[in-house]
Every structure is written in structure tokens, then in C-alpha cells.
Regions:
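Short, structured beta-strand segments at or near domain termini in extracellular proteins/domains
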Residues: 287-300
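C-terminal motif of bacterial Sec signal peptides marking the signal peptidase cleavage site
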Residues: 14-15
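Bacterial N-terminal signal peptides that target proteins for export
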Residues: 1-5
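C-terminal, low-complexity/hydrophilic appendages and adjacent surface loops
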Residues: 52-55
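Short capping motifs at secondary-structure boundaries
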Residues: 65, 80-89, 164-165
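Functional-site microenvironments in short loops/helix caps that host divalent-cation chemistry
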Residues: 20-24, 37-38, 44, 49, ...
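Acidic-aromatic/histidine active-site loop/patch
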Residues: 73
Length: 303
């Protein structure tokens, strides 16, 4: 990322199992990489008029493709790093820019911050924040192999995709898959009102009721899959797509992220929907952005 633009964009970053009970700490998640085939088709992409950037709705057709059943995990990304020695954007030395705050002259990344009178920022730059330490050096992913990897910039996701021979989904592929064959998805709750995705319940950002069993990221696969057999397309972490976008305040090129995260709440942004989209600087990861991949080169299953 061109980090001189980070201070301007910091406030504008995206904020946003067993069905019988919240999974809670009992769920260890899914391990190993698996893909499912999603047959092509036409659907109405987008939404409106609540969020201008999601509309107008339009009919889009996608060809069949393979897609990861879950977000890329810490364990999967660790295997990539071990094999290649890859360093993520957050681990690299930033440019030595004049007048930059000292903390932005060392490797680090953006971490969510609950605003207060003493510190009204929604996001802060934390030295040492990277995929092994998502919120800074005091947090470790040890013992969290099956959680989605975060603090991943677009370039990092692309590098992983090239290594495994896959690609990031287009926005249309992602949204078609997220809908799971259903044109209009209801609120992600069961008949008794219990959450069926990892998003923020309560008054964001001051009171998290934790009804879904998670304050932060959940291991992948702890909630019921959608109609295509895909987990966590809604909530948990935002996911990169290959689609570029535009944001007037951005200091560099942006791409579209989809799906919402554990920070999305009904009272604040309600972005835990297939049509939701945000525009994220390619060079900047955060502690609530991850990714999954598709494969359009591999032939579909024999009919």
C-alpha cells in the first residue's frame, strides 16, 4: 500500500454448525482444502436502494466454476509461506515518507479500534500486525489453524492463488455462489432467531451480545452451509474478489470485497448480505479481511 494515504482512508475502511445453538468454543472448524462445483446460471446481482454502491440490480449470467467450500485458513496460508518464503505486504518495510508518524515507518497494518473519547478512531495502524499476529504482536494464531487467515492484502491473496493454481472469484461468481441458489436471502437467523452466521449482534460497537458464540473470527465451517455447500459466505470475514472498483478518497487502486464480517451489525451497516460490497485498497489488509478461491480451468464434473 502507498501508506501515505492510509491516514486519510483509515476512517473509511470497511466496517462494517449446529443450528440448535451457537457453536461457541466447541467448534474447531474445518481443515483441509475442498472445492465444490457451482453450475452456471443467471441471477439478479446487486441490491438497492439502501446502499447506492449495490445498485441498480441487474441480471448477470455466470458459467460454472469450482469454489472453495471455506475461506483460506491460517494453516493453508502457513503452508504457502513455508514452501515459498513469501512475505505479506504487512511484513514488508514501508517507504520512508517525510512527516509520517513513527509507527507507520515500520511494518504493520490496520486493526479495528472501538472509538472512545480518548481515541475516536475506528481503525489504527499497529506496528507488527500481520497474518501471524492479526491485531498486533500480543495476539498469535497459534492453536487457531482453522480460522480464516486475515491481514491479507490483495497482492497477498493473488500470490497464494498463483501458488495453488487457482484465482480470486469475480464479483459475479462470488455473489452467485453466496446466494446458494436463492434469489432473496432472509436475515441469517433460524426460525428461533438464533444467528446462522458470524456477525455482530447488539449495539455496534459498544455492546456485543455474542449471540452467535463469537466476539471475533470463528473457525471456518462452524455455521450451516448454504444451498451450494459453502460455509461462511456471509459474515466471519470480508473476502477479496478480482473485481476492481472506485473510491474517491482512495490513495491507490481498490478492489471489491464481499460478504461482511464479524464487525457488521444491523444497527450500523448490515453488510452481511450477498449483495453487499465495499471498496478496499489493494495494498492494505485488515483483521477482518480474508479470501477464498475459484478454479475456472478445471473441467466440471461429468454429467
Amino acid at each position: 500500500m502507498q501508506r501515505f494515504g492510509f491516514a486519510l482512508g483509515l476512517m473509511l475502511l470497511s466496517g462494517c454448525s449446529d443450528a440448535s445453538a451457537p457453536p461457541g468454543a466447541m467448534c474447531t472448524g474445518l481443515s483441509g482444502s475442498k472445492m465444490v462445483w457451482v453450475s452456471g446460471g443467471s441471477f439478479v446481482m446487486g441490491d438497492g436502494p439502501q446502499y447506492d454502491e449495490e445498485g441498480p440490480p441487474q441480471t448477470v449470467t455466470v458459467q460454472g466454476f469450482w469454489i472453495d467450500t471455506h475461506e483460506v485458513t491460517n494453516a493453508e496460508f502457513a503452508a504457502f509461506v513455508k514452501a515459498t518464503g513469501y512475505k505479506t505486504m504487512a511484513e514488508r518495510d514501508p517507504p520512508k515518507l517525510p512527516n509520517a508518524p513513527p509507527e507507520m515507518l515500520v511494518p504493520g497494518s490496520a486493526v479495528f479500534n472501538i472509538p472512545s473519547d480518548a481515541d475516536p478512531r475506528w481503525w489504527r495502524w499497529v506496528p507488527g500486525a500481520q497474518w501471524r499476529h492479526p491485531s498486533g504482536l500480543k495476539e498469535s494464531i497459534v492453536g487457531r489453524d482453522n480460522e480464516p487467515v486475515v491481514q491479507i492484502a490483495y497482492q497477498d491473496a493473488e500470490a497464494y492463488a498463483q501458488w495453488v493454481g487457482k484465482e480470486l472469484p469475480s464479483e459475479a461468481q462470488w455473489e452467485y455462489a453466496a446466494r446458494g441458489g436463492v434469489a432473496a436471502l432472509p436475515e441469517p437467523v433460524d426460525a428461533n432467531g438464533r444467528p446462522q452466521a458470524n456477525y455482530y449482534q447488539g449495539a455496534f460497537p459498544v455492546k456485543n451480545l455474542n449471540t452467535d458464540g463469537y466476539v471475533g473470527r470463528a473457525p471456518v465451517g462452524c455455521f450451516k452451509p448454504n444451498g451450494f455447500g459453502l460455509y461462511d459466505m456471509i459474515g466471519n470475514v470480508w473476502e477479496w474478489t478480482s473485481a476492481s472498483g472506485a473510491r474517491a478518497d482512495a490513495s491507490e487502486a481498490v478492489n471489491i470485497i464481499k460478504g461482511g464480517s464479524y464487525l457488521c451489525a444491523a444497527n450500523y451497516c448490515a453488510r452481511y448480505r450477498p449483495a453487499a460490497r465495499q471498496f478496499q485498497e489493494r495494498g492494505l489488509g485488515t483483521d477482518h479481511i480474508g479470501f477464498r478461491l475459484v478454479d475456472t480451468k478445471k473441467a466440471g464434473p461429468a454429467s
